Curated annotation (Swiss-Prot):
Its main location: secreted. Expressed by the skin glands. Belongs to the frog skin active peptide (FSAP) family. Phylloseptin subfamily. This is Phylloseptin-O2. Keywords: Amidation, Amphibian defense peptide, Antimicrobial, Secreted. The modification Serine amide is found at residue 19.
Amino acid sequence: FLSLIPHAINAVSAIAKHS
């Protein structure tokens, strides 16, 4: 589960970069 946290952060970071 902990491995999923960094993955979610990476997704949010990508979305923020796209915005």
